A protein has these predicted regions:
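Alpha-helical transmembrane segments of integral membrane proteins
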Residues: 119-345
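Gly/Trp-centered helix-boundary motif
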Residues: 1-146, 150, 154-155, 162, ...
Length: 345
């Protein structure tokens, strides 16, 4: 009588034969980008800060004005000390009697961050409405410069020849042009007329600054896009498109432009931070947004008069600029790492 003995190898083969083959799900490009971005805690935090900034500027500002019962340009006589004429500090209350209302009226006005200067305007509301101005200048100027830069970079990088030469020389001219002197001259010659251009929905001065930043800022994205297109124009998919008879315009629009989405997104966030900082600097010097329209820069311009005693007038607008520019820069760094295929998942 023979006895059948199953060896370990035989048992293993029998078990394995009943196991379903494991399927590996391929991850798409944007899914990989999201996974890399999600694992960067600093980038996620920066994105949250940027979202909060937009919410505070465009939803929080009108809501706060409604709840407080006054606007950013409302002047309060009791917003300044009647003896020293210095602005009141944070969390100051102005009673109904001081507002000229019936003293028995229950209502009173709260200045959360104090007043902004000798006019006694609400610093908190002016910072919120100043965020609208800074973000509008940053976003619109970045949109204009990126659109113009992408067009110029595509033309120069793909067509080459005399077009590349002309655009490259134009980039060099714009890079070295003293745009600050141009802004000063423009402010003197046509300042009031340009500041009144609002397009029906922008604060005064925003369109002018956005236009100037576009004209003198497109060279940066143009140089980046030109370099990317130069590295792509000899790839196989471009050669295949040429062999099928696709026109240059179709190749640039349908084959090259989709590959520029990643650098466009990354560098747009960095350019927004640069434009916000430039607007604040010009407004501080009196060359940007004019009073009474609130801007972080022109809020800081009044701070030197009170920096020894009312230091909050310097601290709060300065913190707003610091947090905003840092958030956009860190977000740009995180997006750059997320779009980099060499980054680990």
């Amino acid at each position: 009588m023979s006895v059948r003995v199953d060896t370990p190898d035989a048992v293993g083969l029998a078990v394995d034969s009943h196991v379903e083959p494991e399927t590996v799900k391929a991850r798409g490009y944007w899914e990989l980008v999201w996974i890399r971005f999600r694992r960067d805690k600093i980038a996620l935090l920066s994105f949250g800060v940027v979202v909060l900034l937009f919410a505070a500027a465009f939803a929080g500002a009108p809501l706060a004005a409604h709840l407080l019962g006054h606007g950013p340009n409302t002047i309060f006589d009791y917003g300044t000390n009647p003896t020293t004429f210095t602005p009141v500090g944070p969390w100051s209350h102005i009673s109904a009697a001081q507002l000229g209302q019936d003293p028995t009226h229950f209502g009173k006005t709260l200045l959360i961050l104090g007043a902004d200067g000798q006019l006694g305007r609400d610093l908190f509301l002016r910072i919120l409405y100043g965020a609208q101005v800074s973000l509008e200048v940053g976003v619109f100027a970045t949109f204009g410069s990126v659109v113009l830069g992408v067009i110029m970079g595509l033309l120069a990088g793909y067509l080459r020849g005399w077009i590349d030469t002309v655009i490259s020389r134009l980039i060099e001219i714009v890079m070295v042009f003293p745009y600050l002197l141009f802004i000063i001259a423009l402010k003197i010659v046509a300042g009031p007329a340009l500041n009144n251009v609002t397009l029906g929905f922008l604060p005064k001065g925003v369109f002018t600054l956005a236009l100037i930043f576009t004209v003198f800022g497109w060279f940066y994205p143009a140089r980046i896009m030109r370099g990317v297109v130069l590295s792509l124009r000899e790839k196989e998919f471009v050669e295949a498109a040429r062999m099928t008879g696709a026109s240059d315009l179709r190749i640039m629009r349908s084959h090259l432009l989709p590959h520029l989405v990643a650098p466009i997104i990354v560098y747009s966030t960095l350019i927004i931070a640069t434009n916000i900082l430039a607007e604040a600097g010009l407004s501080f010097l009196g060359l940007g947004i004019d009073l009474p329209t609130p801007s972080w820069g022109n809020l800081l311009s009044t701070a030197p008069d009170y920096y020894r005693t009312q230091v909050w007038i310097l601290i709060f607008p300065g913190l707003a600029i610091l947090i905003t520019t840092m958030a956009f820069n860190l977000l740009g760094d995180g997006l750059r790492d997320a779009f980099d295929p060499r980054s680990t998942i």
